């Protein structure tokens, strides 16, 4: 049997390409793939679409290197040093990256739905929230990027409970 063991340089060179959508795991400062992120930066692989739950300094490094086009995250912080990662905060305020924002629980449910092969997941906890109505990537901007879903969510009546609404959230295509 052939070994699959390889260096970070070989792995990134083989599996990460410009314009890829990357899901980066871990929680803020724990279990983050810093060595792989540094290798992405060394190889200058850009135009990345990042999916990350509660994210940390590794994604901030990619943003600082100018390699991120869009990010979908619930939270990004260097917990020991700041409430919000510096480069991420600057990039969002200066409109240098597209920023989609879901709550941590909705994002986790969406990842689970993606793992199950579902195109979307129904949730209730975004109903009436500013996350649903005011925050996120505009419809006009979404049309320019084939890696982004056409809409942040769709409101639909619950087919099992007439009169009750659901928020249909797209799952990431990773």
Tell where the protein language model's regions lie, with residue ranges.
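Conserved alpha/beta enzyme-core scaffold
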Residues: 1-174
């Amino acid at each position: 049997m052939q070994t699959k063991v390889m260096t970070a340089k070989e792995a990134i060179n083989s599996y990460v390409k410009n314009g890829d959508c990357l899901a980066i795991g871990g929680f803020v400062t724990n279990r983050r793939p810093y060595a792989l992120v540094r290798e992405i930066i060394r190889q200058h692989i850009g135009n990345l679409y990042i999916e990350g739950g509660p994210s940390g300094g590794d994604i901030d490094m990619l943003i600082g290197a100018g390699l991120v086009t869009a990010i979908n995250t619930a939270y990004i912080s260097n917990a020991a040093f700041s409430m919000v990662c510096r480069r991420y905060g600057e990039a969002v305020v200066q409109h240098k990256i597209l920023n989609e924002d879901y709550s941590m629980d909705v994002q986790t449910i969406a990842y689970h739905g993606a793992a199950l092969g579902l195109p979307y997941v129904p949730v209730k906890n975004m109903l009436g929230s500013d996350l649903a109505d005011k925050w996120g990537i505009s419809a006009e901007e979404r049309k320019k990027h084939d890696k982004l879903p056409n809409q942040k969510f769709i409101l639909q009546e619950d087919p099992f409970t007439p009169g009750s609404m659901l928020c249909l959230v797209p799952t990431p295509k990773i």
